[in-house]
A protein has these predicted regions:
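Short, flexible coil/linker elements and helix-boundary hinge sites characteristic
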Residues: 6-7, 70
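Conserved catalytic block of serine-dependent lipid acyl chemistry
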Residues: 1-5, 27
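Lipolytic serine-hydrolase domain surface
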Residues: 14, 20-153
Length: 153
């Protein structure tokens, strides 16, 4: 909302929310300004991806932030569901799956396997957020170029 008020073009702005964490704050009665900001984001049709995981008991899995906040006009977020089990090796997944806080943080941790969701690839990679949202996740083969020998992509 700040960027819009300061002249940024809507097509150059995007929002990535993880674990439906926005709702943890926005549903509080005192969060009127946050709800107004979310309504402005929706009204301006900004690209917005909300990532959720069934494995995470702390997130609002299955929710639609736009509907949950009672916003009727505009386009809500593209909801992307991620399976941490597919992102992690068996031993890593086994070691974290009962640690609720560690599972919740997995949204922003590096993935051990390529999937359609990688926090770091979405924020720092070459693929535009609008393209990621349209496809429901990262391109199947990212990065587009091959990494030099001995380096991980």
């Amino acid at each position: 909302e700040f960027a819009l008020r300061h002249g940024q073009k809507p097509e150059r702005i995007g929002l990535l929310t993880t674990g439906s964490s926005l709702l943890k704050v926005a549903l509080h009665p005192a969060a009127a300004k946050l709800r107004e900001a979310v309504a402005a984001i929706i009204a301006n049709s900004l690209t917005w991806i909300d990532v959720q995981s069934l494995t995470d008991p702390i997130n609002f899995y299955g929710s639609d932030p736009k509907k949950a906040l009672g916003i009727t006009a505009g386009k809500g977020p593209r909801i992307v569901r991620v399976r941490f089990r597919k992102q992690l090796g068996k031993s890593t997944y086994r070691s974290i799956k009962y640690n609720f806080f560690r599972v919740h943080r997995q949204f922003v941790y590096a993935a051990e396997r390529r999937t359609g969701y990688s926090f770091h690839a979405i924020l720092c990679g070459p693929q535009p957020l609008s393209e990621i949202a349209a496809n429901g996740g990262l391109a199947r083969r990212w990065p587009a170029r091959k990494a030099p020998e001995g380096q991980h992509p």
